[in-house]
Amino acid sequence: MVAKIIDGKTIAQQVRNEVAGLVQQRLAAGKRAPGLAVVLVGENPASQIYVSSKRRACEEVGFLSRSYDLPASTSEAQLLELITQLNDDAEIDGILVQLPLPAGIDNTKVLEHISPAKDVDGFHPYNVGRLCQRAPTLRPCTPRGIVTLLERYQIDTFGLNAVVVGASNIVGRPMSMELLLAGCTTTVTHRFTKNLRQHIENADLLVVAVGKPGFIPGDWIKPGAIVIDVGINRLESGKVVGDVDFDLASTRASWITPVPGGVGPMTVATLIQNTLQACENNDNGVSA
């Protein structure tokens, strides 16, 4: 068996094109373009790359894009004050604070200070709670992007045994909620899980998000399984690989996401979708 490739790059471009078309319709109807504020504190090289890709994506679809590049010496109080101003700014529909933040700034306090109605990353407890209660509004970007990939490829998930490897607030936990909504029987594994191999060998749908290159051996994959690899790891050679041994896994799975070009592009595309949704919610008087 040779797995079919789930091409996130192509689907992400489709999503961007769809959003760009909807923005043009808004402008033609006399409405304003959605606005996204991207806040970067410090000079983390990886964060700078991520932020530049998000800003570029915004501009490509016709959003108002505002950048706030703050020095590493910025205090927590100063950052919270900026977020307060952006919460009150009628031109801004989405606020994105790039993580990680410098030492001395409480990530949780900062993320919870963002208005849930402008939380386009989907990290605010209100939005995570809505997802848990089967009434999602702004959904965490990577899990929602994965669901979009499964939907676009018409992969039926109802009744599947799904296993999520990794229990982070950004991917693992909200992903488990998305899979429940998608009709899966869902297991979340983590660093205290015993018999990890046994769980994976029983998985019809496997989502791996641990940030360790080749963490899941390919021969653990159940024949015919759907494999979603969220990991993005750069080796010393410069090669970028995922958390799953792709070469062997792709001979056993029915569908698999490559790294790069799988889940990664969908995270930014979903951020764009969420920003448009936040703008439309604002138009319609829908508040968090």
Swiss-Prot record:
Listed EC numbers: 1.5.1.5, 3.5.4.9
Annotated keywords: Amino-acid biosynthesis, Histidine biosynthesis, Hydrolase, Methionine biosynthesis, Multifunctional enzyme, NADP, One-carbon metabolism, Oxidoreductase, Purine biosynthesis
MF term (GO), any: methylenetetrahydrofolate dehydrogenase (NADP+) activity
SUPFAM superfamilies hit by this protein: Aminoacid dehydrogenase-like, N-terminal domain (SSF53223), NAD(P)-binding Rossmann-fold domains (SSF51735)
Entry binding sites for NADP(+): G166, A167, S168, I232
GO cellular component: cytosol
Gene3D superfamilies associated with the record: Leucine Dehydrogenase, chain A, domain 1 (3.40.50.10860), NAD(P)-binding Rossmann-like Domain (3.40.50.720)
Pathway entry: One-carbon metabolism; tetrahydrofolate interconversion
Subunit structure: Homodimer.
The protein's name: Bifunctional protein FolD
